[in-house]
C-alpha cells in the first residue's frame, strides 16, 4: 500500500491545497494531511478548526485523513511507517526552497518527496496572502472552499 504525507500549517486551507490533496489521493492509496504546529506562530485558526475545515473540504476523498504533528515532518512520516511526502509547488521560488528540504529529508531520514505543480489558477494562492488580502478588504471567496470561506468570514468579523 502506498502512503504519503502532505504537510503544512493550512491556516486556512485553500483551494490550492485541496487541488494538491486531490491529485495526491489519485496517485496514492493513502494520503495523510499533517497539520504541523509551529509553537512560535499564533495561527488565525486553532488546530481543531483546521482539522474540521480540511475534513469538511475533503469528504469526497475516502483515502485521505487528517492528523496533527509537531517537529520534523520526517519524524512524523517515519513514525507512521511511511516513506514519502507530497508538496505542492507554485513557483520557482517554492521549488528552490522545497528542493533543499527534500534533499535534507532524504539525507537525514531516507524520505522521498514528490512535487505536484499547482494548477495555474491557484499558482498565486497562499494562506498568508489570503489573510492579508482579506484584512485589507479584498474578496478571497474564490480561493477558499465554501465551508472554509464561511468560517473565515466569521473569524474576520469577530463572530466566531
Curated annotation (Swiss-Prot):
The record marks 17 as: Transition state stabilizer. One of its GO terms (cellular component) is cytoplasm. Pathway: Cofactor biosynthesis; coenzyme A biosynthesis; CoA from (R)-pantothenate: step 4/5. The keyword Glycoprotein does not apply. ATP binds at residues 9-10, 17, 88-90, 98, 122-128. HAMAP family: PPAT_bact. Reversibly transfers an adenylyl group from ATP to 4'-phosphopantetheine, yielding dephospho-CoA (dPCoA) and pyrophosphate. This is Phosphopantetheine adenylyltransferase. The lineage of its organism: Bacteria, Bacillati, Actinomycetota, Actinomycetes, Mycobacteriales.
